[in-house]
């Protein structure tokens, strides 16, 4: 059986972004340390203020450089809102 963690973070103002992002990084590290297999993130647009959700592929690429064993996935990806070439490049970053 495999277990995953779903990361989602919201802030009420840009001043909170650093704290929110650092908390998500810490959660991902703890998930890996505790033996979870994957971290999933949302790819939602225009749903309130969630700094990581605007481009979770970049955030996942950052986490991939920090973590060694865990896999990454997007829980929802709104493909029509992405340019096809840019989307392929973002996904390729994680390969």
At which residue positions do the language-model features occur?
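Glycine-rich anion/phosphate-binding loops
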Residues: 18-23, 80-93
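Conserved strand-turn element in the central/C-terminal portion of the radical SAM core barrel
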Residues: 73-81
């Amino acid at each position: 059986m495999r277990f995953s963690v779903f990361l989602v973070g919201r802030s009420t103002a840009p001043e909170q972004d650093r704290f929110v992002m650092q908390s998500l990084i810490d959660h991902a590290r703890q998930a890996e340390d505790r033996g979870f297999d994957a971290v999933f993130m949302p790819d939602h647009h225009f749903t309130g203020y969630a700094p990581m959700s605007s481009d979770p592929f970049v955030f996942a690429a950052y986490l991939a450089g920090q973590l060694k064993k865990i896999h990454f996935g997007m829980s929802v990806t709104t493909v029509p809102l992405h340019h096809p070439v840019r989307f392929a490049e973002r996904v390729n970053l994680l390969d």
